[in-house]
Amino acid sequence: MWGQGVRRFTTSVVRRSHYEEGPGKNLPFSVENKWRLLAMMTLYLGSGFAAPFFIVRHQLLKK
């Protein structure tokens, strides 16, 4: 008896909740401004690409 009530409550909560739909609405960052998105992606991907080179440079200069 109690289990059925819990099940009905959880399904009704899920049914009542609604998120925005559409392209880019399920991402943790905004895709509305393409220039800001370009800058953020360049910074993110560029830092990952450049990190090994900076680490090697640091190790070579460390002596």
Swiss-Prot record:
It comes from Carlito syrichta (Philippine tarsier). The keyword Manganese does not apply. This is Cytochrome c oxidase subunit 7C, mitochondrial. Belongs to the cytochrome c oxidase VIIc family. The chain crosses the membrane at residues 34-60. The modification N6-succinyllysine is found at residue 25. It is found in: Mitochondrion inner membrane. Component of the cytochrome c oxidase, the last enzyme in the mitochondrial electron transport chain which drives oxidative phosphorylation. The respiratory chain contains 3 multisubunit complexes succinate dehydrogenase (complex II, CII), ubiquinol-cytochrome c oxidoreductase (cytochrome b-c1 complex, complex III, CIII) and cytochrome c oxidase (complex IV, CIV), that cooperate to transfer electrons derived from NADH and succinate to molecular oxygen, creating an electrochemical gradient over the inner membrane that drives transmembrane transport and the ATP synthase. Component of the cytochrome c oxidase (complex IV, CIV), a multisubunit enzyme composed of 14 subunits. The complex is composed of a catalytic core of 3 subunits MT-CO1, MT-CO2 and MT-CO3, encoded in the mitochondrial DNA, and 11 supernumerary subunits COX4I, COX5A, COX5B, COX6A, COX6B, COX6C, COX7A, COX7B, COX7C, COX8 and NDUFA4, which are encoded in the nuclear genome. It holds the Pfam family COX7C. GO terms for cellular component: mitochondrial inner membrane; respiratory chain complex IV. SUPFAM superfamilies: Mitochondrial cytochrome c oxidase subunit VIIc (aka VIIIa) (SSF81427).
